[in-house]
Each structure stands twice: as C-alpha cells, then as structure tokens.
C-alpha cells in the first residue's frame, strides 16, 4: 500500500512568517546534512521525510555538498520527492545552498557568479 500523509499534519506545527514575503515556514525544518549520504540506508531516509511531513515539517534543507559524499543528499531527496511526494510538491519548501568546494580548479568553490550558477544547475539535476 502506498504511503499517504497524515490528514492532521498541519494541526500541531507552528508556522511563522518569513519577513514580509508572505511565506510561512514551520518552526522546525528537516536538515539533510550528514543523515542523507550514501552511508544511510535509503529506507531510513524515506522514513525520516515521511515522519517529518506527517508532523507538519514542510521545509527540507539541503546543500550542494551535503552527503557524504557531496551531492548525495540532493540525489536521495530527489528520489524521495519523485516516489513519495510527487503529488505534494506545492506543500513543500525545498532549500539548497552552495559555497563549499565541489570540483577542482578556481571555479569549484565559494561565491563567484560562475560557481553559484553552476551549483544551482547541478543541484536541480540531482533533485
């Protein structure tokens, strides 16, 4: 039987406005840093995301270097997004960030325009 999110998932979570943007974020977000790499079984990652969402956690925080190894957290979350959350995408806030070394050479780290654009493109492909 396919997983169905809890009907009461928004009843107990506190949501706070983000500045004057109108966006509301849950008081707790799920960060996918060291718990979403290749060393964590995929089913455990799925369970974490499902449980978080059932508790009203709608913000999933990633980065291009999360894993380990770098990038694997975005890849794993992308698989879960397609398999479990495909019909729920409009209920989620997914953030990613860039800044740390990802590839060799002078353009593989920090904040140059080239690095940020390439990192965004790569993150979108992984997810």
Predicted feature residues:
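Generic beta-strand or strand-like secondary-structure segments
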Residues: 76-80, 93, 97, 115-122
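Structural motif corresponding to the early beta-alpha repeats
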Residues: 84-111
